[in-house]
Each structure stands twice: as structure tokens, then as C-alpha cells.
Design a protein with these regions (language model features):
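Metallocofactor- and cofactor-centric catalytic cores in central/energy metabolism, strongly enriched
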Residues: 1-161
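Single conserved hydrophobic/aromatic residue that forms the stacking wall/gate
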Residues: 162-171
Length: 171
């Protein structure tokens, strides 16, 4: 909590995992010597960036973008990208932490990551969503790739789920 004092969602995830492994962990002093808990609880990398895009009225909008690369011990980072107004760094660190464990259980060589933005596609035109996603990816692309980080879809990814086509979208 001292390292990440304003991230309650992340604290919750870490505390839940640590409480379930505590008994087994305490049987192995070599885990402590290897600083396993701290290495597991601190993400490898966190990218935080501004996403600037233009809405249908020509106004410049700004959102925050994030990618948490939590752990790649068994393979490239793998995890979804979420677009929702509630997205913040604490939530994405929580989800990346969980994703690391989920992916390890698949037996596929994938680490854990998660990304997203506080952008909400709800109420936006398809063109606005497209402009936002293009701006988001222009920032994110340099940190991902098949051997490094493989994003996937998550909440809010898929413009047709939240918008209905208007006549201006069809032309």
C-alpha cells in the first residue's frame, strides 16, 4: 500500500491473492529470499499517455490511455483493452494482475497485461469511436507486438455495440 497509496482496486486484488497463498508461501523461505511477493505485485511496466482526438463537431477531446504490462515470465503480455468512463490506473493494474494468473492457468505461454482508456463509446458516432481508437493506437503501437504484448478486446471495444448508425455514418 505504501508504493501505490491511491489504488484501492489494485490493493484489493493483491490482498486477496496473498491471503490465499500465505500458508503455502510461508512453508518456503526461498520465496522470501527471491523477493517473490514484491516481484509479483509490482508490474513490469505501466504506460500512461494522453489520447487527443476530434469529435464530430470539430472539437478537440482529450482522454487518458493506459497499458499495464504486469508480468511476462511465461510469455508475451496478453490482456484486453477496455474503453469505459470508469477506467483508471488502479483498475487496470488490478485487471492485469488477475490476467497474469488467468493466463498462467491456460498452460499457453502468455503473460498478463491490461489496457484501456477513460473514453466511453456510449453516445458517440461510429466516426468518433474510430477517430478515438486510431489516436489511442497511435500512442500504444510502440509498446506492443506479437513477441511483446498482444492486446485483445474487452468492455467498450466494438463501436457497433454502443451506437446506432446515423445517416451521416453511412456516407
Amino acid at each position: 500500500k505504501r508504493r501505490f497509496p491511491n489504488e484501492p482496486e489494485y490493493h484489493q486484488a493483491v490482498e486477496e491473492v496473498l491471503s490465499t497463498i500465505e500458508e503455502e508461501y510461508n512453508k518456503h523461505p526461498e520465496f522470501d529470499k527471491a523477493n517473490l511477493i514484491e516481484r509479483l505485485c509490482i508490474p513490469d511496466r505501466v504506460y500512461q499517455f494522453r489520447v487527443t482526438w476530434v469529435d464530430d463537431k470539430g472539437n478537440v477531446q482529450t482522454n487518458m490511455g493506459y497499458r499495464v504490462q504486469h508480468n511476462n515470465a511465461i510469455g508475451p503480455y496478453k490482456g484486453g483493452v477496455r474503453f469505459h468512463a470508469s477506467v483508471n490506473l488502479s483498475i487496470l493494474k488490478f485487471l492485469a494482475f488477475e490476467q497474469t494468473f488467468k493466463n498462467s492457468l491456460t498452460t499457453l505461454p502468455m503473460g498478463g497485461g491490461k489496457g484501456g482508456s477513460d473514453f466511453s463509446p456510449r453516445g458517440k458516432s461510429n466516426a468518433e469511436v474510430m477517430r478515438f481508437v486510431q489516436a489511442f493506437m497511435l500512442e500504444l503501437w510502440r509498446h506492443i507486438g506479437p513477441e511483446t504484448d498482444v492486446p485483445a478486446g474487452d468492455i467498450g471495444v466494438g463501436c457497433l455495440l454502443y451506437t446506432s448508425p446515423s445517416p451521416r455514418d453511412r456516407s
